[in-house]
Amino acid sequence: MNNDKEINSEKSKRAINHFSNKKEIKNSDRRGILFSKLPSQQLNPDRYDNLMTFWNNSLIDISKSCNILIFTPKLLSTYFTVENVSPIYLPLILNEMIKTKFIVKYEEYIKDYGWSKWVWTKMVVQPFQYYTGLSTPNTETEKNVKFILPEMIKDKAEQLYQHQLKNMNSTTDNIISYINLEKSIKDWYITREELDLLLLVLFRDSKVLILTNNKIKNINNNNNGEDRIGIKFAFDGEKVQPIQETDFGILKLQTTYETLKQQESKLLTDIEEISNTIKESIRIKQKNHALLQLKKKKLLESILEKRATASTNIHEILFSIESAKSNQQIIESLCTGVSTLKKVNQEISVDQVDSILDDYQDAITNQREIDDAMKSGFNSVESLSSADIDEDQLEKELDQMLQDHLTLEKEEKQKQKQIEKEKQQQQQPPTSQFNPNLPIPLKNEEDELLKELESLSVTSNPLPKQDENKQKTSELI
């Protein structure tokens, strides 16, 4: 496992690389503006807001990208150095962040929680002081005072809790050794002091409790947190339960089981190496050496068998404990249910139930009698009202009405057709005087037509000139 110094070194490299690759920083002109002096908010509010927004976002960005949860002005100056140039006015910017509570000294952050429990004070706060040197005077206080982003810490603490919830598949998985917790988030690249800070937040939210080595009575400031042997997490949607003796037993079994599995893995590797050595000794005909290695192999195999048996037994014990805890939860739930049921039933007696049911039955019977009476009454009224009516006469009258209706409907349709026909005739264009479809009159017919025309001309008034022309034209025809 990487120590805190290696982790901090790696995070510094990542932070420097991440910041230098920002688009605004790659542009030298833009970088010069961003690295310039922070103006007065009263005199130049727009420029002030733009610069503060940039530096706030930059700090959040590297914190999230590189998991930098605790930082100092000196470290930030290193992170923000580009081409050997750092923002010399960074302290002024940090002061503005402090004023707005955007960043907080984590010493104050710890004090603000106001914990009085001995466990947390001894197991976490004092190790923090060891990490940071807060318990001793610092010659470079301003540069080395450590700060945090409160919102970032809260988000990361919740992320840690959700990470552990995914691994809690049984009633005993909520207890984990401190070392295994560190291993499970190894890829996060956070230091032990940062992990403790996250646990601090979860402790405040009643999501974790710290299992400590109860053999240590007086905690030394230089213990580096080694007395914290395990963490007990709350199940989803619940508050963490108080630590019990069984929790220490479970943690001890888990630790022993993991140790045995590691020993088994080591023994298997050693046995494999010895087997290869035996083969090589046989190949070069070193019988005595091969025999010695074979005895060693048999001894290791015997030890391996014992370790495997022990680990199996411990695993079975853990499984039994898990089953017992599940049974305990079931019994507790049943007890709660029975107690609640008794309290509810105290307000209801058997006589009360019988009385209510009798009243209910009487009410239903009475309702049915009323319904039957009303139904019978309506039937009687209907029969009386229809006694003097001739049903056959009604049917004949109804048939006649239907027939009249059909006749009227037929007449209406015929009238409608006649109206539509007349409309169509009116809409047709006038026909020409000469219709080629008419039959051509014969000569005798022409003579008769001419005589009739002459008789008409005698009796009628003289035709206008235009009509005379038409007449001549007709005669010519």
Curated annotation (Swiss-Prot):
InterPro entries: Snf7_fam (IPR005024). It comes from the Eukaryota. It holds the Pfam family Snf7. Residues 252-280, 382-428 form a coiled coil. GO terms for biological process: late endosome to vacuole transport; late endosome to vacuole transport via multivesicular body sorting pathway; protein transport; vesicle budding from membrane. Residues 411-424, 465-477 have a biased composition (Basic and acidic residues). It is found in: Cytoplasm. Keywords: Coiled coil, Cytoplasm, Protein transport, Transport. GO terms for cellular component: cytoplasmic side of plasma membrane; ESCRT III complex; mitotic spindle pole; multivesicular body. Residues 411-477 are annotated as: Disordered. Belongs to the SNF7 family. Plays a role in the endosomal sorting pathway. This is Charged multivesicular body protein 7.
